[in-house]
Amino acid sequence: MLSASPPAQATVRMLGIDPGLRFTGWGVIEATGNRLRHIADGVIATDSTESVPARLRVLHDTLTSLLVTYHPDEAAVEETYVNRNGTATLKLGYARGVALLAPALRNVPVAEYGAKAVKLAVVGTGGATKDQVQMMVQRLLPGATLKRADAADALAVAICHAHHRASRSAWARGAVMA
């Protein structure tokens, strides 16, 4: 009698986005079971001398191009934090809106995670420093070059999504008991 081989695990490609009006980090990873693989990452920079609408268009057009190039199955965006500078918070909100809209327009499901949730998923503590996050991203994704912190943060958002996705899948299969 032949034993049945375990079912093949699906590979899911995810785009992580760390939105900002000046610099938006992005990172693409693949998850197969609990294995993660780095695909690409980078930063979208806008010209601060341009108008806000022009900068948002650059952000939208570039994110759309990334969606066409990398064909992610899902996307994840870091939630906005509120700081003392109301104008800066509003501009960050504009960029975040574009980061949520671009994948949605291509029918790519979008998840949102707060900074503490991302740090907890990647480092194990919600109070992790940027250096700790970057170190763990490099450990979890060998080959990622992380030229800018924004790209590392975007990859961390994608890793967080992969972990949360795996947990939800285990609950749905009944593999985890309450």
UniProtKB/Swiss-Prot annotation:
Positions bound to Mg(2+) 1: 18, 150
Active-site residues from the entry = 18, 78, 150
Tell me which Pfam families the record gives.
Answer: RuvC (PF02075)
Gene Ontology MF terms in the entry = crossover junction DNA endonuclease activity; DNA binding; magnesium ion binding
Q: Which UniProt keywords apply?
A: Cytoplasm, DNA damage, DNA recombination, DNA repair, DNA-binding, Endonuclease, Hydrolase, Magnesium, Metal-binding, Nuclease
- Where does the chain bind Mg(2+) 2? 78
Which residues are the signal sequence here? none
| Record field: catalytic activity | Endonucleolytic cleavage at a junction such as a reciprocal single-stranded crossover between two homologous DNA duplexes (Holliday junction)
Q: How is the cofactor bound?
A: Binds 2 Mg(2+) ion per subunit.
Q: Where in the cell is it found?
A: Cytoplasm
**GO cellular component terms given for this protein:** cytoplasm; Holliday junction resolvase complex
Which InterPro entries does this entry report, sorted A to Z?
RNaseH-like_sf, RNaseH_sf, X-over_junc_endoDNase_Mg_BS, X-over_junc_endoDNase_RuvC
Q: Which GO terms describe its biological process?
A: DNA recombination; DNA repair
Main localisation, per the record?
Answer: cytoplasm
So which cofactors does this thing need? Mg(2+)
The record's similarity note reads: Belongs to the RuvC family.
- Subunit description: Homodimer which binds Holliday junction (HJ) DNA. The HJ becomes 2-fold symmetrical on binding to RuvC with unstacked arms; it has a different conformation from HJ DNA in complex with RuvA. In the full resolvosome a probable DNA-RuvA(4)-RuvB(12)-RuvC(2) complex forms which resolves the HJ.
Q: Which NCBIfam families match?
A: ruvC (TIGR00228)
* Function of the molecule: The RuvA-RuvB-RuvC complex processes Holliday junction (HJ) DNA during genetic recombination and DNA repair. Endonuclease that resolves HJ intermediates. Cleaves cruciform DNA by making single-stranded nicks across the HJ at symmetrical positions within the homologous arms, yielding a 5'-phosphate and a 3'-hydroxyl group; requires a central core of homology in the junction. The consensus cleavage sequence is 5'-(A/T)TT(C/G)-3'. Cleavage occurs on the 3'-side of the TT dinucleotide at the point of strand exchange.
List, alphabetically, the PANTHER family matched. Answer: CROSSOVER JUNCTION ENDODEOXYRIBONUCLEASE RUVC (PTHR30194:SF3)
- Provide the protein name: Crossover junction endodeoxyribonuclease RuvC
The organism that produces this protein has a lineage beginning with: Bacteria, Pseudomonadati, Pseudomonadota, Alphaproteobacteria, Acetobacterales
What gene does this protein come from?
ruvC
